Amino acid sequence: MGKGILSLQQEMPLEYIGKSYQEVLKIRQESYWKRMRSFSLFEVIMHWTASLNQHTCRSYRGSFLALEKIGLLSLDMNLQEFSLLNHNLILDAIKKIPSSKASWTEGTKQVRAASYISLTRFLNRMTQGIVSIAQPSKQENSRTFFKTREIVKTNAMNRLQTASFLKELKKINPRDWLIAQTMLQGGKRSSEVLSLEIDQICFQQATISFSQLKNRQTEKRIIITYPQKFMHALREYIGPRRGLVFVTSSGKMVGLRQIARTFSQAGLQASIPFKITPHVLRATAVTEYKRLGCSDSDIMKVTGHTTAKMVFAYDKSSREDNASKKMALI
């Protein structure tokens, strides 16, 4: 499938060198136009999203299936038909979907719109501009994108809840208990911990080195220091093995669904009033580091956030607990 779609970008034969620019341009556009009829929107989306990271791939594919379900798009149409659509109108329609037709939150609508824009950008490049790029509205009263909340929706545990959660998790699965502690101390995403290799650990210095890849290009190395008690437990768990740190009984990488299940179960057993997901641990780490008085720049060195604004979004401590509560200026 991939090679077929890449055939959209065939080079022009040398026999056209003697022709004028306008003639060659017309021939090239016609050639692209004819080939576009051979590809369905569905196969293009499947090819394109396969090149994205797992989370984005799943999100984008879900978006297009949802758009087809409510009748805004047909995945069976070919690229010629898709290129003739008014993409800006479709963006506007996504934002104006009534709740009677689809119970989408504003955040969901913006994800659907972003998916659509990304697709048109990809196809604009693949078709040498025949498919136009959908343009988001920037008018004050009808913006396609705007901030829906100041902080992330994810809950964070307090110290007592964290201790209770870890206690229950250890009873359920000691390996997942180690995974949770690795995530908490470093404010790490589940993917960063589940893919961790043993050679990234330095037991002598009690550190673990994490690599974050931004936009699949810029690599950022983050070193997290762990308590000796934890490192001892981790060393005992690993034993003489090599390769991945956390593995299943068959030696494979632990899946996200596995820890999502045990984390949720431990949260229930600890009587925590909200569902514990892997992402809750990241929000908990930021909130706890802030409570302990760490600066945003120090927290960024731990979590890998690129701006203080992102740290603020994850900080779930009370907004009343600020400088005005600690000192009086009048």
Swiss-Prot record:
The keyword DNA-binding applies. The active site is at residues 189, 214, 279, 282, 305, 314. GO terms for molecular function: DNA binding. SUPFAM superfamilies: DNA breaking-rejoining enzymes. Residues 152-327 form the Tyr recombinase domain. Keywords: DNA integration, DNA recombination, DNA-binding, Plasmid, Viral genome integration, Virus entry into host cell. This is Virulence plasmid integrase pGP8-D. It comes from Chlamydia muridarum (strain MoPn / Nigg).
